[in-house]
Amino acid sequence: MTAEAILLHLRYLLVGPYPNGPLSGAALTVWMALLACVAATVVGVGCAVLLDRLEAMPNLRWLARALRGMLATLRAIPVLMLMFWAYFLIPMALGVAVPETATVVTALAAVGAAYIAQSMEAGLRAVGAGQRNAALALGMRPTQALLTIVLPQAWRIMLPSLANQWVSTVKDTSLAYIVGVVELSTAAGQVNSRTVAYPAEVFGAVAVLYFLLCSGIEALPNWLRATSTPQVEMSTWKRFLRWRARPAADAVT
């Protein structure tokens, strides 16, 4: 195989026929994984916070059980099956044509959110109850104590677990072939069909690309933990104590 042919096939693995055609290959894998990871993290953390608050309200615990049941159902459904359902059910429910990539991102985000919610709920419980009680004793509202004291610490505790879920999401994008999305693995199959004599080289290059993507994600928690140091968490207490002391100081003056 000539150098020109190698570069041509490598370009197809990276971006597909873009800009003369739709974006595909590794670029589409990264784009779908990024959207799915962001959506899954936001929804998953939101569900964990909601479950925490619902459990504190005896008359709404049935709603917490219903939400847990829904999340458990999403975790039990195979990702491939969920993509297939999303591909057919979302356009039927909305009554409009929905791009295949949107259905894949929706399915990946739903599954990821279910796992992240479970992880974050465990992280919230891992934070000592004494810290929440101390915040309440200082006059914080329960939701305020949860969001400003407990959640930042739970986030740092569960970062490795979140990174594992993000890596799984990247790898699960390879299942998008079921709805005809030409992501990295599908693009590799197309390249291999053109160069039948070089399957090891083609799929070896794909393995390297997946390794680089997943390694970058696994390194992300270390950077995030460095940017959310305990000093940052303690500053929340300092700001709150200053806010509590300000009315008393104003009254004296």
Indicate residue ranges for each PLM-predicted region.
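Transmembrane alpha-helices and adjacent helix-loop boundaries
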Residues: 1-253
